[in-house]
Amino acid sequence: MIVLGIESSCDETGLAIYDYSKKKLIADELYSQVKLHKKYGGVVPELASREHIAKLNLLAKKIFKETGLSFEDIDCIAYTAMPGLVGALMVGATFAKTLGLIHNIDTIAVHHLEGHLLSPLLDHNSNIEYPFVALLVSGGHTQLFEVKEFGEYSLLGESIDDAAGEAFDKTTKLLGMGYPGGVEVANLADQATDKSKYILPRPMKNKPNLDFSFSGLKTAVLNTWYDEQDQSLENKANLCYAFQDAAIDVLVSKCAKALQKTKNTRLVISGGVSANKLLRHQLDLLAKNRGYQIFFPPMKYCTDNGAMIALAGAYRYVNGFKDSNLEINVKARSPL
């Protein structure tokens, strides 16, 4: 069973083809709009939608040409329906539904977060058994789930204000740095010369619940930098290190609590922030010290991509899900 996946929820245009019977990704194409939005310091929704319109058909032609497949080989077309930028989602959904109608292929709506949650399965070496705890950590979401079976997700905790990735992005703006924030902060943090110069708070780390808060950490960065008389690149690197260290410390602590609370021994990490080297290192240490299994997506599939949508669509399709009509039903916000 072969699925074409389409991702267009924000500023990445992604198409991929996944073979469920072989558990194999056949092809994957991605166009990133980062350069387009970089000069604005963030994603401009109207521009994002227009870029999806311009690139989707080109990527589709490329992916079929390179694989030698045709639409006759496709059993289902999966597309991101929620959450995301409504205009961008509508472009991808309309493209998918149109292809489905023309070629008489079933279509299936996929939740963007479910795609991220399953993305570690794109690693051929990953054999993830249920149940497990999952941390979704990105620019728009920071959530902990207990996953008992496919499609059975229990929310354990989430950010009550800024998502972790959002805090990274806002920190770069406060410090007059570039976009996207996660990469900029991590790269500059690697250049820190005095890792103990700044001590920042760990919001909600010691709270018994599994919720997060990163707004206060962002404000602490602002106040610290405002009070700093020597705003040199060296001190900016030291502050980036302190921020990243605090944010990662909270994420790892909450993951440990979630595993203890649910009595699980398997942990799945996904979303854009899962590419962070310090986060991976600290969670690997946690797993090693406590005997847990930990699963990350391949680095190239941490951010938005069509491969995870094709994968999630395949799992949904074999579980009996598919669209019942041609209605375009996308949502900016939607819980998993």
UniProtKB/Swiss-Prot annotation:
Pfam families: TsaD. The keyword DNA repair does not apply. GO terms for molecular function: iron ion binding; N(6)-L-threonylcarbamoyladenine synthase activity. Its cofactor is Fe(2+). It comes from the Bacteria. GO terms for cellular component: cytoplasm. Substrate binds at residues 136-140, 169, 182, 276. InterPro entries: ATPase_NBD (IPR043129), Gcp-like_dom (IPR000905), KAE1/TsaD (IPR017861), TsaD (IPR022450). Transmembrane segments: none annotated. It catalyses: L-threonylcarbamoyladenylate + adenosine(37) in tRNA = N(6)-L-threonylcarbamoyladenosine(37) in tRNA + AMP + H(+). Binds 1 Fe(2+) ion per subunit. One of its GO terms (biological process) is tRNA threonylcarbamoyladenosine modification. CDD domains: ASKHA_NBD_TsaD_bac. Fe cation binds at residues 112, 116, 304. Its EC number is 2.3.1.234. HAMAP family: TsaD. Required for the formation of a threonylcarbamoyl group on adenosine at position 37 (t(6)A37) in tRNAs that read codons beginning with adenine. Is involved in the transfer of the threonylcarbamoyl moiety of threonylcarbamoyl-AMP (TC-AMP) to the N6 group of A37, together with TsaE and TsaB. TsaD likely plays a direct catalytic role in this reaction. This is tRNA N6-adenosine threonylcarbamoyltransferase. It comes from Francisella tularensis subsp. tularensis (strain SCHU S4 / Schu 4). The gene is tsaD.
